[in-house]
Curated annotation (Swiss-Prot):
Protein name: NAD(P)H-hydrate epimerase
InterPro entries according to UniProt: YjeF_N_dom, YjeF_N_dom_sf, YJEFN_prot_NAXE-like
Catalyzed reactions: (6R)-NADHX = (6S)-NADHX; (6R)-NADPHX = (6S)-NADPHX
Family that this chain belongs to: Belongs to the NnrE/AIBP family.
Organism annotation: Pediculus humanus subsp. corporis (Body louse)
Length: 228
């Protein structure tokens, strides 16, 4: 059975991937974002209009990568990216999306506009390093996601959730969760329809060290697998 990680374990594994196994951030981000886009296609292939909400960190980078691949898969993604970073990696990811004619919104639509204009929301705002409370600049988007009737797909962690203890009062309730590397403890509280595992890049020795039991879940060349 796949093991669920504490917040500190997730941080430690990430650091080992970078420092011991010499993965680069953009390597892992590309693999993670690709696996997310494939999982989304598997569950929502009949939809077209997708809004990808990106935060300022690695989770947001995963969202930008996913948006690019979703475009290639025939979807019509738009991106809401309220707090951009000046790091070259994120600037390049943004440039790639713009070069593929992916629209970037200046403001988050209200819940009614969201229902009229989009069929799926990809939540790539906060990752496993998140600690409450939500910062003021993200309160508006979190309120909209909480009220929206459009199904939400959360990447790794449903934004605003405690990484180990799950959903706060009035938190978002995603229809889909894509856990990356390995599920975090909050995934035990996920009650949506689809739970996928993505990010197939963990070396066997690292998997054994943390007793993750993840690589056996995958088959063939799949880079994501349904857990629920």
């Amino acid at each position: 059975m796949v093991r669920y990680l504490s917040q500190q374990e997730a941080i430690d594994i990430d650091q080992e991937l970078f420092n011991v196994y010499k993965y680069s951030v953009d390597q892992l981000m590309e693999l993670a974002g690709l696996s997310c886009s494939i999982a989304i296609y598997k569950c929502y292939s009949k939809l077209k209009k997708i809004l990808v909400c990106c935060g300022p960190g690695n989770n947001g980078g995963d969202g930008l990568v996913a948006a690019r691949h979703l475009k290639l898969f025939g979807f019509e993604p738009s991106v809401y990216y309220p707090k951009r970073t000046e790091k070259p990696l994120y600037q390049n990811l943004t440039h790639q999306c713009l070069a593929m004619k992916i629209d970037f919104l200046n403001d988050i639509p209200d819940a009614k506009e969201m229902s009229n204009n989009y069929e799926l929301i990809v939540d790539a705002l906060f990752g496993f390093s998140f600690k409450p409370p939500v910062r003021p600049e993200f309160e508006k988007v979190m309120n909209v996601l909480g009220k929206s009737k459009v199904p939400i797909c959360s990447i790794d962690i449903p934004s605003g959730w405690d990484v180990e203890n799950g959903c706060p009062e009035n938190g978002i309730l995603p229809d889909m969760l894509i856990s990356l590397t390995a599920p975090k403890k909050c995934a035990k509280f996920f009650n949506g329809r689809f739970h996928y595992l993505g990010g197939r890049f963990v070396p066997p020795d690292l998997e054994r060290k943390y007793d993750l039991k993840i690589n056996s879940e995958y088959s063939g060349t799949e880079c994501c697998v349904q857990l629920k």
